Curated annotation (Swiss-Prot):
<dbReference type="InterPro" id="IPR004214">
    <property type="entry name" value="Conotoxin"/>
</dbReference>
<feature type="propeptide">
    <location>
        <begin position="20"/>
        <end position="60"/>
    </location>
</feature>
<keyword id="KW-0528">Neurotoxin</keyword>
<keyword id="KW-0800">Toxin</keyword>
<dbReference type="GO" id="GO:0090729">
    <property type="term" value="F:toxin activity"/>
</dbReference>
<keyword id="KW-1015">Disulfide bond</keyword>
<protein>
    <recommendedName>
        <fullName>Conotoxin TsMLCL-04</fullName>
    </recommendedName>
</protein>
<feature type="signal peptide">
    <location>
        <begin position="1"/>
        <end position="19"/>
    </location>
</feature>
<dbReference type="GO" id="GO:0008200">
    <property type="term" value="F:ion channel inhibitor activity"/>
</dbReference>
<dbReference type="GO" id="GO:0005576">
    <property type="term" value="C:extracellular region"/>
</dbReference>
<dbReference type="Pfam" id="PF02950">
    <property type="entry name" value="Conotoxin"/>
</dbReference>
<comment type="similarity">
    <text>Belongs to the conotoxin T superfamily.</text>
</comment>
<keyword id="KW-0732">Signal</keyword>
<keyword id="KW-0964">Secreted</keyword>
Length: 74
């Protein structure tokens, strides 16, 4: 009969210590997703193409506004 209270006390102490499987699964998925996002890299060729297009457009706009200031003399 003395074992029953001891068993109940141990059961009460052990149950909050057990991890919630759903919570740990969600945390594991979030960590994995963060690592995959950090591993993604921008395509350098794409970025160079965008920058080149912006430079060309800015040069055309600048030359149409002020020829003496922006456009190099040929």
């Amino acid at each position: 009969m003395l074992c029953l209270p001891v068993f109940i006390i141990l059961l009460l102490l052990a149950s909050p210590a057990a991890p919630n499987p759903l919570e740990t699964r969600i945390q594991r998925d979030l960590i994995r997703a963060a690592l995959e996002d950090a591993d993604m890299k921008t395509n350098e060729r794409f970025l160079e193409g965008v920058i080149s297009t912006i430079k060309d457009f800015a040069g055309k706009v600048c030359c149409s506004v002020s020829v003496n200031f922006c456009c190099p003399t040929a």
